[in-house]
Structure formats: C-alpha cells, structure tokens
C-alpha cells in the first residue's frame, strides 16, 4: 500500500492530481445542487405549518450539516499532522478552513431569514444558534492563528491545536436541541427513526446535502492546490509552472 501511495507524496504530483479531480467533483456538485434546489423550490409541496418559508431549508440544512462536517475533517487532519508530522494534513486543514467558515456563515444567515417568520425575530441566543456562531469564530480563529506567524510550520501547529480543542463544540451543536429546551426544531432526518418530513420534500433535501458535500470536496481540492503553491513557492516545479503561465 505504501509503495503505491509513495509517488503521491510529492507536492507536484498532488497538485496535478487535484487539478484532474476537481472538475469531476465540481460537475457533480453543480448537477446535484441544481436539481435539488429547483425541485425543492418549484415542485416540493408547501409545508402545512410553515407554508413556503420552509424552502430555505434546502440551503440552510446542508450548509449547517457540512459546517460541522468540514470542521470534523479539519480536526482529523490536524491530529494526523501533529502525531505523524505529515505536512499534507496541515495543508488540508488550512485549505478546508475558509470553506467551513463560508458554510457556517450561510447557515447562520439562512437560519436568521428562516427564523424571522417562525420566531418573529432574526436572532435569539438559542443554544444551537449560539454554538453555531462559536463554530464560525473557531474557523476564523484557525485562519487568524495560522496567518499570525511568519513561520508557516508554527502557525499550522498552533492552528491545529485550536482546531482539535474546538471539536468539543460539535456535539454541543448536534445535541443541543435534546439537552436543553431550545427554540430550534429537532432533526428532520434521523438514523433510526422515520423522517419527520414528507418524501417529496425529503428527496430534494438529500440531493442538496450530497451537493454540498461534493461542493466542499471541490472547493477543498482547489484550495489545496493554492496551499501547495504557497508552500513550494521557491521549488523548481512551481517556478516552471509560473514560467509556463507567463
């Protein structure tokens, strides 16, 4: 296995491989999101309680799910980087951070828009909302800490430690509606129970969830290539690449 993986340890190989894979993931993401959002907005029936305001769910729920998923992936990468000193893991963590921050911001904004007609206010200091806001600040903190040091290795290590510590916030976000009496509704899709939403509403939601997953992979591959160029900016292969682009 290691013999097969060894050629991919080179940053130049990783750069070109990500370039080949990113259009594939991008195309799937666009297709899934286009079908899911159009289906959800135009063809899914109105909710019997919320009317048409529920349709923002097709952006809010996937963004909220993958705001946590991306952070969890960053934490795994940070652990790998700190334990086994694998530079690619540090670069992956940094590459994912802006994407996770973007998803978290989308989740917060769409949640506020959805909450206005439901709760009568744009924002309440609800347990889940507050924990999601903390998640956004964690993303910003990871990026800020990484950029705060002139030595990229020190910055990556410091940001990785913060990322790992911040993982404690993920179960708080997920279980807050069960642990405390909150305004936020419970999960519409559960692993062991029948979904609480109708199938015509559920199918486009699932498409959008997978669409956001492929979107996150696509953006991560693009961002990872950028981080590789920064890391190896003085290496011959990057200089050669720059000369070809001129």
Name every feature range the model reports, one short phrase each.
Residues 1-246:
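Polytopic transmembrane helical bundles with strong interfacial aromatic enrichment
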